[in-house]
Regions:
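C-terminal "cap" of GNAT-fold acetyltransferases
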Residues: 114-118, 122-129, 135, 142-161
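Conserved acetyl-CoA pyrophosphate-binding loop and the N-cap/start of the following alpha-helix
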Residues: 91, 95-104
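A conserved beta-turn-beta hairpin within the catalytic core of GNAT-like acetyltransferases
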Residues: 75-83, 92, 111-115, 149-151
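Active-site acidic-Proline motif in GNAT/NAT acetyltransferases
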Residues: 88-90, 94, 123-124
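Solvent-exposed beta-strand sheet faces enriched in polar/charged residues
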Residues: 74, 84, 118-120, 140
């Protein structure tokens, strides 16, 4: 019998326009997580759909040719990469986040060799914060930001590579 452990194979590829549109218009999250719908903020939507703006910083993550989610990687200081990420709505909340996040961190390390990785998360998103803490992101500070036509509190977190 075949007892080999399944190794999750994630592939990172630069996001195409078609993929950006698929994510922007068809990914809808439930309840308070609808905050993360691209269409919830016109400005974010326009930025996300603009290939020049996305540049080569946005990657789609696939597994067996299925889109699992996406990551953005932005160099914010000489040795610091700030990441953004999103998972396909029907995969959220089922314990897939940790593997997905780990894959993104590994990809960032191998591609950019940062000393530090940062991210910002809405403070109401306790579910995500728990996952970030699990792989040793630490809390840096909270800040207020205008988005989706309102002001929200965000938590900045940091990971030492």
């Amino acid at each position: 019998s075949d007892t080999r452990r399944m190794i999750v194979e994630y592939k990172f590829e630069i996001m195409t326009q078609e993929q950006a549109e698929e994510i922007a218009f068809n990914w809808h999250y439930d309840n308070e997580y609808s905050f993360y719908d691209m269409e919830a903020d016109q400005e974010d939507l326009v930025d996300f759909l603009d290939p020049k703006n996305r540049g080569d910083a946005n990657f789609v993550v696939t597994k067996d040719n299925d889109i699992i989610g996406y990551f953005s990687f932005n160099k914010v200081a000489i040795n610091t990469i700030d990441i953004g990420l999103g998972m396909r709505p029907n995969l959220v909340g089922n314990g897939n986040g940790l593997e997905f996040l780990k894959a993104g961190i590994e990809f960032a390390k191998s591609k950019y060799s940062p000393q530090k990785i940062t991210l910002s998360v809405a403070t109401f998103n306790k579910r995500a914060i728990k996952v970030y803490r699990k792989i040793w992101f630490i809390e840096v500070e909270t800040f207020m930001q205008d988005t989706n036509g309102d002001r929200f509190e965000f938590l900045k977190m940091s990971y030492q590579c």
